[in-house]
A protein has these predicted regions:
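GST-like domain detector, emphasizing the conserved glutathione-binding G-site
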Residues: 1-130
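Conserved beta-strand edge residues that scaffold enzyme active sites
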Residues: 41-42, 189, 207
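Residue-level detector of family-conserved "landmark" positions at structurally sensitive sites
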Residues: 37, 71, 185, 203-204
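GST-like fold's C-terminal all-alpha helical module
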Residues: 105, 109-197
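Phosphate-coordinating loops and pocket residues in cytosolic domains that bind phosphorylated ligands
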Residues: 51, 195, 204
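Acidic/histidine-enriched, glycine/proline-rich intrinsically disordered or flexible terminal extensions
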Residues: 206-220
């Protein structure tokens, strides 16, 4: 079996980096042993992180000579090398559906990213959400409700937590941080995600971090 010392996942701030959270959750869900390598948010790297510099590619998985740094690529790679984890749905149409909503998360919802950046240590009661971000929230809720209805929960694609849940987990934390009002079925799903052991572990670690970014206007 692959030892943890031979596989690394490079991530950045647990509190602020939603893509790091996604990659780490995917790696944990895969069951692949790995070592987490942190990129500190210091004065030298902060500007690059805020500008999404190509020289800072996080998360980045290194495994048996392969380097994979895009979150969707990491998801596909882990599904390939850890098939027993069933990160993607087994049925073809469900798998296509999963890839589509993950792609939508990967490339879309720019208003949400800008207006509600991830910040696990913060809480803003009665936060005022502008219309474009609200439109993104409504679309995400529609995606979740369709999946929970079609595949009967408790996770987006049925009985097993997978890629889609990991991709949308940082959005769940945003809804908590910014006090987004949700209907009971969606609130229940969010509570389920927050209670998932790997998600809870990441959040606990984020709350213990000391780094602060005063102005965060882009997701990394």
């Amino acid at each position: 079996m692959q030892s943890a010392g031979e596989t690394t996942l490079t991530v950045s701030s647990r509190n602020y980096s939603s893509w790091s959270m996604r990659g780490w959750l995917l790696a944990k869900l895969s069951g692949l042993p790995f070592e987490t390598v942190m990129v500190p948010i210091d004065a030298a790297s902060r500007a690059e992180l805020l500008l999404l510099s190509p020289s800072i590619r996080v998360p980045c998985l290194t495994h048996e000579g392969a380097k994979v740094w895009d979150t969707l690529a990491i998801a596909e790679y882990l599904n390939e090398i850890c098939p027993d984890a069933r990160l993607l749905p087994q049925e073809r149409q469900a798998r296509a559906h999963c890839r589509s909503i993950c792609g939508e998360m990967h490339s879309g919802f720019n208003a949400l990213r800008s207006a509600l950046p991830m910040n696990l240590r913060a809480h803003f009661p009665d936060f005022r959400i502008w219309s474009r971000a609200q439109h993104d929230i409504e679309r995400i809720v529609t995606i979740w409700r369709e999946c929970l209805t079609q595949y009967h929960g408790p996770w987006l694609f049925g009985d097993e937590i997978g890629v889609a849940d990991a991709m949308y987990a940082p959005v769940v934390t945003r809804f908590l941080t910014y006090d987004v009002k949700l209907e009971p079925d969606i609130a229940d799903y969010c509570m389920r995600v927050l209670a998932q052991p790997f998600v809870a572990e990441w959040i606990d670690a984020a709350k213990a971090e000391q780094d602060d970014i005063d102005e965060l206007d882009m997701e990394f």
